């Protein structure tokens, strides 16, 4: 810099990119395929970026729908797309499954995968107590075994050309693109829902 301080060479984009493809899922059929004993499941996934001690989660991918047995359904996952690496620090991938509640559909965590150099690590034999099958991750969990609810359903990356950033006292950041004023999710500067514009 002008004062003799070194200029940073490494930098990261603000925000986490939305995955470009739906997850690749294969259903393992069992003997009970009667319609009354099957269910349709929707799966999607997000990227997780680490910034210091803070984890930032992307908006979800498109969903994939599969039909499987309620009692013993097994869905195998593989071929997760390679995450972008240049100027992003994506360290994880979270897989979610839709759960139908009394009045709404929520996506709940199935598992979290480690991402190294953009690729999901599936070389381990087990992950979080689940044994891989020929490099494929099996979901055999019952609904009550699922984890946290997806919170980033409506998150978006900061819009292209965002300028004039101002910290607000409520934890939000405001900025503008042309004549549009944008706001981030409170205390989450990587998430800029277009509904807040």
Task: Give the ranges of each region predicted by the language model.
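Disordered, low-complexity "stalk" and linker segments at domain junctions of extracellular
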Residues: 1-197
């Amino acid at each position: 810099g002008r004062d003799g301080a070194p200029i940073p060479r490494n930098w990261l984009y603000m925000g986490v990119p939305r995955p470009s493809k739906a997850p690749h899922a294969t259903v393992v059929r069992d003997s009970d395929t009667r319609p009354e004993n099957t269910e349709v499941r929707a799966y999607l996934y997000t990227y997780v970026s680490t910034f210091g001690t803070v984890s930032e989660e992307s908006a979800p991918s498109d969903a994939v729908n599969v039909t499987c047995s309620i009692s013993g359904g097994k869905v195998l996952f593989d071929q997760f797309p390679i995450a972008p690496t240049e100027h992003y620090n994506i360290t994880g991938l979270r897989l979610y499954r839709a759960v139908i509640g009394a009045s709404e559909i929520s996506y709940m965590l199935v598992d979290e995968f480690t991402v190294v150099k953009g690729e999901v690590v599936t070389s381990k034999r087990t992950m979080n107590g689940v044994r891989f099958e020929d490099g494929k991750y099996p979901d055999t969990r019952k609904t009550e075994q699922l984890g946290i609810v997806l919170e980033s359903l409506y998150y978006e990356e900061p819009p292209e050309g965002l300028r004039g950033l101002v910290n607000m006292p409520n934890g939000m950041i405001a900025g503008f693109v042309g004549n549009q004023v944008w706001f981030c999710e409170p205390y989450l500067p990587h998430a800029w829902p277009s509904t807040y514009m």
